[in-house]
């Protein structure tokens, strides 16, 4: 196998119920050769098959289930072996979700958690989260699926791994509301609750930062201009260094109280500022939650 025949490999793991099945289906749609529930001890043998495939397996997605500590011993050794093979471009995609979301999903599907087959789902979730702490730390892409519908998870994966963008350094800029929690997949979090809040202007209350009247209001203040100047300078300085260190994506989260007005406005602004230089994806996690600030 030569470097001209590089193989792209994505190892998909994470919390049970966080969306591994949807993720594998998404990779299959992207033309990846997919294998689910591959025992880690078989990974070295699978790598040999990839090397002998003569280019027929140049994009591979593996769903790996880690429910016993003995599995990790095999996995760490296999990952170390991967790092020595220059013809494989590996990614570890870790799917996560809030405990409350996972419990709800188990109740909706009436399934038992694999680590608590006769007990409460939350006990199994807690045990699995402890087991996967090191795995999550080793992953180079972490996706929080708590607020994602299956279609939205597919869109995220396509954005991250489609042929046009998978080699690029990606910047995800998202708005959120602190009242709904900080995004667990955020690398950088900025709090803009110090800015004037259009929520308290009655006719702007039902609007969002996507509406011109709201964005114009937020952007007209001197403190907003000063903050954006400092923020863009900081981000512009940091991004090349993150890229140099081998990070494949950066998630920047901007939060206000409810994720409706201020954070949405500034997220849109930052996304437009970065798009000329980077592959940028802008999203608004809580913009549909019209429950007030």
Curated annotation (Swiss-Prot):
Q: Which domain of life is it from?
A: Bacteria
What Pfam families does this protein map onto? PapZ_C, RapZ-like_N
Query: GO molecular function: any one?
Result: GTP binding
InterPro entries xrefs: P-loop_NTPase (IPR027417), RapZ-like (IPR005337), RapZ-like_N (IPR053930), RapZ_C (IPR053931)
Residues holding GTP: 65-68
Alphabetical UniProt keywords: ATP-binding, GTP-binding, Nucleotide-binding
Kindly indicate whether the keyword Thylakoid belongs to this entry. Answer: no
Q: Which residues bind ATP?
A: 14-21
Recorded hits in SUPFAM superfamilies, A to Z, give: P-loop containing nucleoside triphosphate hydrolases
Which HAMAP family does the annotation name? RapZ_like (MF_00636)
Q: Which family does it belong to?
A: Belongs to the RapZ-like family.
Question: What does this chain do?
Answer: Displays ATPase and GTPase activities.
Protein name listed in UniProt: Nucleotide-binding protein BC_5156
> What species is this protein from?
Bacillus cereus (strain ATCC 14579 / DSM 31 / CCUG 7414 / JCM 2152 / NBRC 15305 / NCIMB 9373 / NCTC 2599 / NRRL B-3711)
């Amino acid at each position: 196998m030569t470097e001209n025949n590089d193989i792209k490999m994505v190892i998909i793991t994470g919390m049970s119920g966080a969306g591994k099945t949807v993720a594998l289906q998404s990779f299959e749609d992207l033309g990846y050769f997919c294998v689910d529930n591959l025992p880690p001890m078989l990974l070295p043998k699978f790598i040999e098959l990839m090397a002998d495939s003569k280019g027929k397996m140049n994009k591979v997605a593996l769903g790996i289930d880690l429910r016993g500590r003995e599995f990790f011993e095999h996995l760490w050794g296999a990952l170390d072996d991967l790092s020595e093979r220059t013809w494989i471009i590996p990614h570890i995609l870790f799917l996560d979700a809030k405990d409350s979301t996972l419990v709800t999903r188990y109740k909706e599907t009436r399934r038992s958690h694999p680590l608590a087959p006769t007990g409460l789902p939350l006990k199994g979730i807690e045990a699995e989260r402890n087991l996967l702490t090191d795995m999550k730390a080793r992953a180079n892409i972490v996706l929080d699926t708590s607020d994602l519908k299956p279609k939205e998870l597919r869109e995220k994966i396509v954005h991250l791994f489609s042929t046009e963008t998978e080699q690029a350094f990606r910047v995800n800029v998202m708005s959120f509301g602190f009242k709904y929690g900080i995004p667990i997949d955020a690398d950088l979090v900025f709090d803009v609750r110090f800015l004037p809040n259009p929520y308290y202007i009655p006719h702007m209350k039902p609007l969002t930062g996507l509406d011109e009247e709201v964005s114009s209001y937020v952007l007209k203040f001197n403190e907003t201009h000063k903050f954006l100047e400092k923020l863009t300078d900081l981000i512009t300085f940091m991004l090349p260094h993150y890229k140099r260190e081998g990070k494949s994506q950066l998630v920047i989260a901007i939060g206000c109280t409810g994720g409706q007005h201020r954070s949405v406005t500034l997220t849109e602004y930052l996304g437009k500022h970065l798009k000329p230089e980077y592959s940028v994806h802008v999203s608004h996690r809580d913009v549909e939650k019209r429950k007030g600030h």
